[in-house]
Amino acid sequence: MPDHSYFSNLIWQIADLLRGPYRPPQYERVMLPMTVLRRFDCVLAPTKAKVLAEFERRKGGRLEGDALDTHLNNAAGQRFHNHSALDFERLKGDPDNIEKHLVSYIKGFSKNVRDIFDFFEFEAEIERMREANILYLVVSKFCDVDLHPNTVPNEQMGLIFENLIRHFNELTNPLQDFPLHGGLAG
């Protein structure tokens, strides 16, 4: 089984697609939410059909909001769910509608997950990537990264995020390792 360095490097290779439309310190605006999104996609894959069936059964009924989320979370066997018929494979299969479908896919998540992507202001980044003609490439490359817990256990996933965040911090503040003592600051 590959270690966290393998997956971190794989994700950094995808970040190279952002070069041009994004400066390196801005890569985290895309790479963190896309990594989270792909992980959630992989986690929910085994129960996708069950969640969709439960959503269809409950749709239009008396349950909505938190109550509906609770039932769908139970169907997913997680503290979150996605009731969209979309997933990364389906997104990859429709390049002409990638922006619309990606936004729709994110809106299919339970509120607790949608809040994460709202915090990232990710819809603006989706639009920016589409305008730069790299959205499909980024989604397609992430689709090829298997972040399922059977492949990447939670502890290893934590190390991947830690590695990515450390790398982004280094890009944001490249001079942090060069203290200015005396001469240059004075």
Please provide the spans of the model-predicted regions.
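Non-catalytic, mostly N-terminal accessory regions of nucleic-acid modification and defense proteins
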Residues: 1-186
